[in-house]
A protein has these predicted regions:
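N-terminal beta-alpha lobe that positions the nucleotide/phosphoryl donor
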Residues: 1-176
């Protein structure tokens, strides 16, 4: 079974192609002996598994290939709403909840969830401010909602416009 959630101290967590550059850079700094906040990285494969389990791949492709935003809007809405409203598959949810509990046990109730898209911080684009970060999360529900919101942020209008400007589509990338 694939590991979808890894501690930042694990060597594999420094893989930006799986976890996105934000998480991978945090992991690499920790591996170099620099102090980092404790945390976990979510594999972008978890995002794809969630999309597939919800039957959203046709909407993903349709939104990505639409030439006009107006043509993509209904598909984007379906993806975003489904990511918020439909259950997270157990193979993804269980390690997320285990990681959350580990953080609560180590650091207390207030947690942070940050997005880490695979294409962030590439040459010529930073994506600064395009996605989401959530601070002060206390409950399990808030934590899971924040993960969902990070996944859905890949489909936000501002992010899509930025990606279009840089010749990227949400179907070509994923969110860790």
């Amino acid at each position: 079974m694939a590991q979808f959630v890894l501690g930042l101290g694990e060597v594999a967590a420094a893989d930006a192609t799986r976890f996105g550059p934000k998480a991978a850079n945090q992991a690499a700094l920790g591996h170099a002996g620099l102090p980092i906040p404790g945390g976990y990285a979510v594999d972008a494969a978890a995002y794809w598994i969630q999309l597939e389990s919800l039957g959203l791949m046709d909407s993903v492709r349709a939104a990505a290939t639409a030439e006009l935003f107006e043509d993509a809007r209904q598909h984007i809405s379906r993806v975003r709403i489904s990511l918020f409203d439909e259950p997270i598959v157990p193979e993804v949810l269980e390690p997320l909840l285990a990681a959350r509990q580990s953080l609560v046990d180590r650091f207390g109730k207030l947690l942070v969830v940050r997005s880490s898209a695979l294409m962030e911080d590439q040459a010529g684009s930073t994506f600064a401010g395009q996605f989401e970060s959530f601070l002060g999360l206390e409950s399990e529900d808030d934590f899971i909602t924040a993960v969902r919101a990070c996944w859905a942020a890949l489909w936000a209008s501002r992010a899509r416009q930025y990606m279009t400007h840089h010749h990227i589509t949400p179907a070509d990338t994923a969110m860790g």
